[in-house]
């Protein structure tokens, strides 16, 4: 890949490294993307997944909390937190985060069903 210039370039490089199992390189690329765009949620998700694969669960939680600061209803961030807490043996916290993800998922389904119903009227 040519010298990446944009946050998206670094993000896609991170995806490539992650796919190749090069977790440290993926993390570095996601962090470069975030230096350029600290609110780049996809890069934060990638970072959380790379940390999860590396079994660095505290950093998974940290990355997911950064996502939630941008979007408190991000289902994947709540799921990432739940999985990390579970792996840390923090069952009540894992259940709480998992429940939050499920409730948000149900709300999303209801909104989608409602919008489909309105479109059929």
Regions found by a protein language model. Name each.
Residues 3-35:
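Alpha-helical segment of the N-proximal tetratricopeptide repeat
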């Amino acid at each position: 890949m040519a010298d990446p210039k944009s946050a998206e370039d670094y993000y896609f490089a991170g995806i490539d490294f992650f796919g190749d199992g090069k977790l440290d390189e993926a993390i570095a690329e996601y962090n470069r993307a975030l230096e350029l765009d600290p609110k780049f949620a996809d890069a934060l998700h990638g970072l959380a997944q790379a940390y999860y694969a590396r079994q660095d669960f505290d950093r998974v939680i940290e990355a997911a909390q950064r996502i939630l600061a941008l979007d408190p209803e991000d289902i994947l961030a709540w799921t990432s937190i739940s999985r990390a807490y579970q792996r840390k043996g923090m069952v009540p916290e894992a259940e709480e985060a998992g429940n939050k993800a499920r409730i948000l998922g149900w709300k999303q389904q209801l909104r989608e069903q409602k919008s489909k119903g309105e479109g059929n009227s």
